[in-house]
């Protein structure tokens, strides 16, 4: 039987999971960050990623609803504000739509979800189901991928600005905000997990939760790579560059 880890040992194990499995290791991100994708492939990434962005506040609301401690709720609800904003023109979702607008995608099509890859939809729904059904500790632990976000954000912004003349720093404003939001959120979640994962069984659960979340992010990139890189198998109802870039959903 495994021994109980100290909080710092648990953190080291969690960081090791991220170092091995976080989606910065996926080949699709290497292509994106090094300028190896064309405009249509970048559009496909942004359109499909919106489904994940759209559901982040739904995920956080599901977690919030299970928190009985008002102090904890006050801290966690900031995540919802960060993405929903205080108006229709503010917040992470609005900033992601600003990116898809800048890439030439029709906003109605993006928001409708009609052109998503099935793999994108299934991965995001699996994440929502996970945080709704698992323990509060596991749900919070699943958010710990944010520990690794600042590094990939730095790579993404620098790489996209360097290699794609159709991308501007203004279009990438979403990522600038996440450079401060993600560390704040992950610091809190990590402290919570280290404090509350106080048995061998709970420590195994939080590590499994982070492992699962890494698989959710990886699966979304698998779907994009199969459809838009190689072998190029696109779901018939999914986004097709050129044909759909300005298509308005019926």
Swiss-Prot record:
One of its GO terms (molecular function) is pyrroloquinoline-quinone synthase activity. Belongs to the PqqC family. Pfam families: TENA_THI-4 (PF03070). Pathway: Cofactor biosynthesis; pyrroloquinoline quinone biosynthesis. It comes from Xanthomonas oryzae pv. oryzae (strain MAFF 311018). This is Pyrroloquinoline-quinone synthase. Its EC number is 1.3.3.11. Transmembrane segments: none annotated. The keyword Oxidoreductase applies. The lineage of its organism: Bacteria, Pseudomonadati, Pseudomonadota, Gammaproteobacteria, Lysobacterales. One of its GO terms (biological process) is pyrroloquinoline quinone biosynthetic process.
């Amino acid at each position: 039987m495994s021994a109980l880890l100290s909080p710092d040992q648990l953190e080291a194990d969690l960081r090791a999971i991220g170092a091995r499995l976080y989606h910065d290791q996926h080949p699709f991100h290497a292509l994106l960050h090094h300028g190896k994708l064309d405009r249509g492939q970048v559009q496909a990434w942004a359109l499909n990623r919106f489904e994940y962005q759209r559901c982040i506040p739904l995920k956080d609301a599901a977690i919030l609803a299970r928190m009985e401690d008002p102090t904890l709720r006050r801290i966690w609800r900031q995540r919802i504000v960060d993405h929903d904003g205080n108006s229709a023109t503010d917040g992470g979702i609005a900033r992601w739509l600003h990116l898809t607008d800048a890439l030439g995608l029709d906003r109605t099509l993006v928001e409708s979800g009609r052109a998503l890859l099935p793999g994108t939809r299934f991965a995001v729904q699996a994440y929502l189901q996970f945080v709704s059904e698992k323990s509060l500790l596991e749900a919070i632990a699943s958010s710990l991928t944010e520990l690794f976000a600042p590094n990939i954000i730095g790579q993404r912004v620098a790489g996209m600005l360097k290699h794609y003349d159709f991308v501007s720093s203004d279009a990438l404003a979403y990522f600038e905000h996440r450079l401060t939001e993600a560390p704040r959120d992950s610091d809190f979640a990590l402290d919570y997990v280290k404090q509350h994962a106080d048995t061998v069984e709970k420590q195994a659960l939080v590590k499994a939760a982070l492992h699962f979340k890494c698989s959710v992010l990886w699966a979304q990139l698998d779907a994009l790579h199969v459809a838009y890189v190689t072998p190029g198998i696109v779901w018939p109802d999914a986004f097709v560059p050129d044909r759909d870039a300005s298509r308005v959903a019926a």
